[in-house]
């Protein structure tokens, strides 16, 4: 279902202190955009309505986060979710940057100087048709780009409801010299402790769909 255009979304975002309207300007220098420049930087690709980032950011003030999505109409909901979480926990909102970006062009805003230590990919489009598979966020074409700015030993945390995407992604990671250090095909019964349930995850779980999850380490 396509989200209706919200003409008020961009003005609200531009009035937000942690929104970055032109992320290309910070390529290679992201650490200096945060208050604590010594914190490691984690990246969420496709933050959606911000449920995941709101919890992670407010629970981990010692980590800096970059959260991206493509639509203002989605980003403005993420902004509100993040603000609410920090307000409820009485935390200073100084470790999150929210921005619009096409993930296929992620290499236009990040490079090896940015030293990203972890990437989160949650419930991305599975692109099931063969002619579209190169658009997958876990495809080798994308993983090659991530390797440029992900530190050696850095991790990609990947969650999906889609069986085919998950199994084929295992091959993508192998091809791009990542080691799978954790894997489960039933996350909610796995005993994995620090799982933040996203809006999509909750929906799929209620339908009885098992959630697949892995951690891949850059070698």
UniProtKB/Swiss-Prot annotation:
Annotated InterPro entries: SAM-dependent_MTases_sf (IPR029063), tRNA_(Gua-N-7)_MeTrfase_Trmb (IPR003358), tRNA_methyltr_TrmB_bact (IPR055361)
Listed pathway(s): tRNA modification; N(7)-methylguanine-tRNA biosynthesis
One Pfam family hit: Methyltransf_4
Catalytic activity: guanosine(46) in tRNA + S-adenosyl-L-methionine = N(7)-methylguanosine(46) in tRNA + S-adenosyl-L-homocysteine
Top-rank lineage group of the source organism: Bacteria
Catalytic class of the enzyme: transferase
Disulfide-linked positions: none
Enzyme Commission code(s) on record: 2.1.1.33
One function term, GO molecular function aspect: tRNA (guanine(46)-N7)-methyltransferase activity
Ligand binding (S-adenosyl-L-methionine): 44, 69, 102, 125
Function: Catalyzes the formation of N(7)-methylguanine at position 46 (m7G46) in tRNA.
Name of protein: tRNA (guanine-N(7)-)-methyltransferase
The gene coding this protein: trmB
